[in-house]
Curated annotation (Swiss-Prot):
This is 5-methyltetrahydropteroyltriglutamate--homocysteine methyltransferase. The keyword Transmembrane does not apply. It is an enzyme of class 2 (transferase). The active site is at H726. Catalyzes the transfer of a methyl group from 5-methyltetrahydrofolate to homocysteine resulting in methionine formation. Its cofactor is Zn(2+). Zn(2+) binds at H673, C675, E697, C758.
Amino acid sequence: MSSHTVSTSLAVATLGTPRIGPRRELKSALESFWAGKSTEADLLKVAAALRAANWARQSARGVSVIPSNDFSLYDQVLDTSVMVGAIPEIYGWRGGPVSLATYFAMARGTQAEIAGHGCANGHHHGDSTPQGVPAQEMTKWFDTNYHYMVPEFSAGQSFQLASVKPLEEYREAKALGYDTRPVLLGPVTYLKLGKSADAGLDVLSLLPKLVPVYIEILGRLAAAGAKWVQLDEPALVLDLDDRERLAFRDAYGQIARELPHLDIMLTTYFGGLGDNLDTALALPIAGLHLDLVRAPKQINAVIAKGPKDLVLSLGVVDGRNIWRADLPDLLDRVEPIVQQRGAERVQLAPSCSLLHVPVDLELETGLDPDLKSWLSFSLQKMGELSTLSRALSGDRAAVQDQLSASAKAAATRRKSPKVHDMAVSSRAAAVTPAMTQRNSGFAARATLQHQRLQLPAFPTTTIGSFPQTAQIRQARAAHAKGAISDADYNTFLRGETARAIQWQEKVGLDVLVHGEFERNDMVQYFGEQLSGFAFTKEGWVQSYGSRCVRPPILFGDVSRPKPMTVGWWKYAQSLTGRPMKGMLTGPVTILNWSFVRDDVPRSTACLQIALAIRDEVGDLEQAGATMIQIDEAALREGLPLRRSEWKGYLDWAVECFRLCSSGVKDETQIHTHMCYSEFNDIIDAIAAMDADVISIETSRSKMELLDAFKTYKYPNEIGPGVYDIHSPRVPSVEEMTTLLQLARQRLSDGQLWVNPDCGLKTRGWDEVQGALVNMVEAARQIRQVSAG
């Protein structure tokens, strides 16, 4: 490396930080407020304290460009909707300041009991009950595991400045001594993230009405002293057409004409600009942020084509994953750029907002010391950037210890036997195409399965989990603290399992499940029993609102030391003569809901998990299981943002599912479950998975999702969900028979199973009992109609 350094100090910027607090203080404050145990003033006081602490922590770690307005009580897209007055009429807002009651109604609906209205896999947002108003729709933020509230627009949509939150938080920071860079979601990405209730409305046609509101708030920020404003436009890493590219030129041209002295840092992340590069470089902006973790090579084109006075924000530290950076390697990459452009035109930054990583690694006292030395959470990433800045600003000697420690950690990780297991890599290398194929085609398998299982037409089952009552959660917590012995906890769980099985028999279900009372989370339960995974105590990240998740850390080669579910399956099957499904989480879902190692391709890590699940499937079959369900709730979530990359992902994702499910005899029935709202564009991949039975979420779409399967002539069996588990409302027999008749119009009777949309973990037993009794009766009536 050249010893030449620049004399001016290099700016260190963050694009956004975790809002939840090191100990999830925001979660506690929100849930206390929602439960009526604290006041609005109490909540706002906690929020202000969290913001102040966030700014102080960044300043202390050498961040010189500190964001404001990155904080949110629920979601930054919802904040933007409120800011621009995009509040649907149903919420009763008629102008003026937007109350917290209105804000949270948009976020959560106004049903009486909101707790636990999510999907049982814990990664969905719930709908409201029929009373009150529903929440806005929620969906994934690009390809992350964060969820945003989808803006709703109508044909007569108007916008107005309804909230000055960005201005308030800028002033709040200024009063504390921090001159921040306010951050707002950019107008084009905001519109693209929304949806219209009116068919045929092009959301981008609303841009001329929206931009003046942005100009108003940006003008007020400038008047208050803001020299720079960060506008997030991650839509620039998506596939865009010429009309969408023109929208960027129109919006930013208008902003620049109205506010010529305000410097805009346009931020892009989650990928490279690709064919949108020329569009971005032609915009009248003062700075451009690039994700150089996901798209490191784009810097060359930007330097070659971009204006020489454009400030480049280099996203060189991974804002989405928890691995420590190799700082000497980064120095080698960044130094030539700084020398070429000058320190005043370069900023060092994470690749994206640090919202997607936990707050502070120092809170983890129980991690393996080697593993801990390879990790970096939000605060540590700020420190890494600060070290990099000092090394590039002539202060190399002062940070030599940090640089050496970084290099040592990277070298140790590359060679560690904790990461690399030759037996695993040898086994993965020996996988053959035959291992990803069932012995026979579906038609031959189905004949054998039907002979063996002797199920009625329209067989009834559930997706896997039953209600996790307060008693179960208390027992789990007590066991975790050591207050209940392993033996006593096991006895308690066996009792719950036995009751659930007796209850299912009484209701009349054809295919039973054991209820999953022993499982805390559908990914964590397996990760804790597989080598290559580690778990944190305080590694929380925000999923949505007050919901936080603690993703497993997939740090090394994966194998299964011993069976994970066989004991529970054998116990459950011993209590009934009816078929008991084995219940597993699929490899793609385990991968997509974890912090994944970055030293091998994701496909390699997934293949290893698939081999471990394959072993479990084989042991369940050996123990006598006739049906094994392998859930792939997150298969679709892993799709790359660019459609050109879909095939590559789907090829290996489907191969991994087939690898874990194809080692069984023809007469063993493989089930899978998926909870998505869109199948048309991946139906080929779903068919290629070749599961004998797939259960899907269809009740809210009135079975329209099945059109994709009908058009495709999908041959295998399908369980379209006949009731929405997200609502506590018990659907009538008639509602479910109506849905089944709609399903029969699209698929043959022999293909259809009858089941709820998703697992029942988050519902109460009273709701579940009423709904499943009606579901079994609906199936009985449809059998009569079909036979008649």
